[in-house]
Every structure is written in C-alpha cells, then in structure tokens.
Amino acid sequence: MPNWIDRLRRWALSALAVLAVAGCARTEPGTTTVRFWAMGREAEVVSELIHEFEAENPGIKVDVQNIPWTAAHEKLLTAFAADGLPDVCQLGNTWVPEFAELDALTPLQPFVQRSTVVDPKDYFRGIWDTNVIHGELVGVPWYVDTRLIYYRKDLLAKAGYDHPPRTWQEWDEQMAAIKRMQGPNRYAVLMPINEFEQQLSLALQQPDPLLRDDDTRGNFASPGFRRTLAFYANMFEQGWAPKMSETQISNVWDEFFRGFNVFYISGPWNIREFKKLQPKELEGQWGTAALPGPDGPGAGIAGGTSLVIFRKSQQKEASWKLIEFLSRPEIQARFHSIIGDLPPRRSTWNAPSLANDPLAAAFRDQLERVKPTPKVLEWERIVQEMRIVTEKVVRGGLAQDKAVEELDQRVDKVLAKRRWMHEQQRLQQRVPSPQSSSAVAAGSAQ
C-alpha cells in the first residue's frame, strides 16, 4: 500500500473512536443495521423515504448520518484511513474515481446482473458511465445535474430572436445583438469567472480529451481546448459578459429578473429558486435551453451523485436492497417532488411532475448528451487549475497560447505521481518473470 495511505491511516486512527460512536446504532436482536452516509439536504429528505424501506424490510434498520458537504470529503478520507467507512454512501460523481483507486468500493455488476430493479439501459448513458472505472461498475447513479442556459424570453425577443441559440455561432450573434440593445451597464450573459463549470461544459463539447497519455498529462494545448478558450474569452473581450466573480454580484436571481443579463448558465436546483423569486409580471417570460454546441446542441457535464457500497461493509446484501429501493422510478419521482433533484433514469421522467414541466424538458434533452470528466482522483485539483488560468486570461490579459501552455504545465505537476506510477507499472510489465526467464535460458542451452 502506498506510503501516503499508511500515513493517512496513522493520522486518522485518533478519529476512529469518534466515528465508531457516531455510526453505531442500537440494534434489536435479529436485525441488520445499514449505515448510510448522505450529504446536505438529500440526507434530510431521504430519511422520509427510509421509513417505507424499513416497513418493507422489517429485518433491516437504516442509520442515516447527515454529513455537511463542506466536510464530507475530508471525513470520508479520515474514515477510510481509520477503517470507519459506512456501508452505503452518497458520493459525488467526481469523487467516485478517487475512492475506486483507493480500492474502497464494492464492484456492483454482480448485484446489477441479478437485479429486477436496476436496469443500466434505463439510465442516461453519460451518467451511468461516471460509475464505470477501469471497466468495473462501482456505483449506481442517484440523482443528476448538468449545466445549461436560463434565459429571458422577453429580452431575447426584443433583440430580434424567437428561439434560444443552438450553436456557438448563433449564440455569438444573439449576444452581440443583446449587448447592442442592453447598453454599457447591462450584459448578454453572466459567467462568474470564479467558477469552472462554464469552461468545462464547453470543453466537453470538443472531440479532444482533456488529458492524454493514459490520463497522465494535460491536453489543454489541443485544438479542441484552444477553440473552447477562444470562444469563452471572446465573451469578455466583446463586453458581452462582465468580468465579475460571483462574490461581486449581489444576487444572481435579482440581477436576472431586473435584466442585468439575458443568459445565465446554471443547474437544475435553480428552477425552484427562479420560480420562487420571479416577479409576477415575468411569469412565463423566462425559460431553459440546452447548451449550444459548436455545430448544434452540445454536450454537458455529467454531474450529480451516486450510491456506493464500501468494500469492507459486512452488510452488502442489505445495502444493495437499500440501493435498489432508492433506484425505483416511483421512489425517484417522489424524491424529485420533495427536493427537486433530477432522476438518472429515463423512465422516471414519465412522472407528471417532470413530463409536464417545460423548464425540466431542456435538462431531459441535455442529459442524453452529458459526458463524464476524466476519471482521475486529481480531477478536482485540475479543474481549479483550469479556473485559475482562464481567469488570468479574462482579468489579466494572459495570451491564450501562453495560457494553454501554462495550464498543461500546472496539470502535469498535479499528475506527476500518477505519471510515475504509470511508468513503474509499464516497466514491471516488461520485466520477465523468473519462470519465463528460466524457460528462455533452458531453450538457449538446447
């Protein structure tokens, strides 16, 4: 086991007692307890559904622990090092590769093969793929998110357009027209430069991968990312987007409704926020649309969370029953009606609350084209490097050619350990085993 994991284990042993106490539940004789860690609002909502699961399965009790998102990653690593992980856990899709590389996740394909509930073909392809690491299924999607366009229908019509953009060229044309209409103190699009999701969404629409050489080096100097950066930076160069971070914007919902910007890229959670905060006179005057792509509606981020069973769980069968329960289309539909999270299964979208919602329809369309990000444990550090460098282009005037070179250098440093490990594995594969060496020597002697 790598030395850093040994150090992590030693550092975390002091937390073991705390985790053990927090995770223990008083269990009646003959009852199995499944420890389930969930995050934020989802943890609160799922507790309402757990009672139904326990009624269906009287021999199983579920101990739900609510982990704040801000502390979740550190707590999971601490628990891994201290052998204190739960049975079932909600994992962000970008965290799945990390815990898979730690060999902490149970392979789920055997469970899926005999399941009458979890049907891989019913899941959006890009979302399902986020849970397949090195060809092995290690999670089941729970809810999904992706980023697309929220837009003001009335202002777009005033600028002369009766439909949202479908291609990058159409988007450029519409933003230019909107800016001419808006004047100097209002804008076509709001793209907070302290975020990375916009750049990442656009980059996933390109054919070039973001990493190369078996995910050991950055590929940001590729033609695809250069096109992405040029398109993104041009929004600011033309004055279509303000050079502002989210902290400089008092309230994104208020600004949207007062016409500060016409387009805004965000996720499904904002459907409820915009509905709640919309002025009465603007009801029906805003909508959602799939992200434009280079040649038509484009790809987007395969975000959301998945349900996993940790490898050291002693309650794998009961844990799988819980995952199956939460994966039922009717349960997912109820989960959506309570919290607004979007379901990962196509069949769930037939529920009236989703099928009859025109604001959700664009997300349904976009989910057919989502793509997973590179499946490396360093990914969250890599996207922060991307954010830093693209902000330097927008704010500091860093030349785009220099920016992609700098970004590749930064990412190569982040991936240095992965590159070394990959090289060691390659060398080991080339070294003949003692038996094969003896056979070669014997053959030569003859």
Question: Where are the regions a protein language model picked out?
Answer:
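Short, low-complexity disordered leader/linker segments with a strong preference
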Residues: 1-35, 55, 357, 412, ...
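Hinge/lid segment of periplasmic solute-binding proteins
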Residues: 93-146, 172, 200, 205-206, ...
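Short, polar/charged alpha-helical segment
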Residues: 41-61, 386, 404
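Short, well-ordered beta-strand elements
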Residues: 30-41, 60-65, 87-88, 187, ...
